[in-house]
Amino acid sequence: SALSAHIVRQTPKEARLHMKTSESYLPEGSYMVQPAVRQAFSTLGALRQAQDEGRILEAVAQRCTAAHDLLFDLGIAQGILPRVSCALGVAEGDTREIAILSRVGKPTCFVVTDIDESTDPPTAWLSRTIVQQKVQDRLLDSLRPGDVIPARVTHLEPFGAFVDAGCGVPSLIGIENLSVSRICHPSDRLTVGQSILAAVRTVEPENRRISLTHRELLGTWAQNAALFSVGETVRGVVRSIEPYGVFIELTPNLSGLAEPRADLRPGMAVSVYIKSILPQRMKVKLTVIDVLAPYDAPTPPRYFITDGHIEEWTYTPAGCDKKTVQTIFRQE
């Protein structure tokens, strides 16, 4: 079966639905569409009720003042998110000011801490750090290595992709964990603002840090090879050039080898003819047909696992004579 190469524990559907609405926290941008959030901005009474309940709300930050307070138009009130309440680590000097400035024009989570009706319009005082502290505490307490969660890409660095693991709480996916196929930069695989899935790699309560991985959700060698047939001509991307041949990515977790060609460079899109697929050697042999126009953006990932929990994942096909590529998600 498709799951034979890895052990996956799926959460029962009813529990999953309950978890997603009440127990888990979603990346920023996920809350604005929720009816309860929209309803909170309908009247001052509804906003006060949301304040009393400590409900997570969300709106787009309209501007950042010279003092680095964020301002929001909540319809029935003006929202002010003071600088020290904009993100975890700001008050302590551990978080750079760009983390505040870059919220302008983006959905931002918060709770209401006070409402001043003496102003016109009324002023709602907000806090994002209260939300993030609560979310970070819950994530550190409840997540285990191998848990599959939603995330949103916030920015890309040469060493990896930073993602929002819930209400703006940051996490890192190292470049080596984005896919099995090697890439030059995370932008070869992901785009800023993209919604993705990820698996928890490590949970470090003492450092208040969670690291994630992505490649285990993108399928084993056999699962990816099953998408192709010998004799087909398909599109691929040149990933690396070696003296003995050119590695061409067919999917993020499947590459093949073609004969050397002087006109090829990493990142080029090409069409390739599939000469052979050899599970025993974990090899796909290709012939380059043509160089194609470059891709505008990375292809959205195809996930073979979309929820639940992974105990272990084995990329290498059964009976293959190559070194086994495997991830075992250990509880620290």
List each language-model region with its residue ranges.
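Residue-level signal for secondary-structure boundary sites
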Residues: K134, S171, T220, G256, ...
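Short boundary/loop segments of OB/S1/cold-shock single-stranded nucleic-acid-binding domains
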Residues: M32-R55, G93-I100, S127-P145, C184-S187, ...
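Intrinsically disordered, low-complexity segments enriched in Gly and acidic/Ser/Thr residues
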Residues: S240-I248, P252-E259, M268-A269
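Short, acidic/hydrophobic/Gly-rich beta-strand patch recurrent on exposed beta strands
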Residues: L71-G75, I80-V84, W125-T129, F162-G166, ...
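OB-fold/S1-family RNA-binding modules
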Residues: A2-L74, T95-T123, P150, P158, ...
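Solenoidal tandem-repeat scaffolds enriched in leucines and small polar residues
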Residues: Q132-Q136, D141-T213, L218
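Beta-strand/loop nucleic-acid-binding surfaces
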Residues: Q78-I98, S171-P186, L254-L264
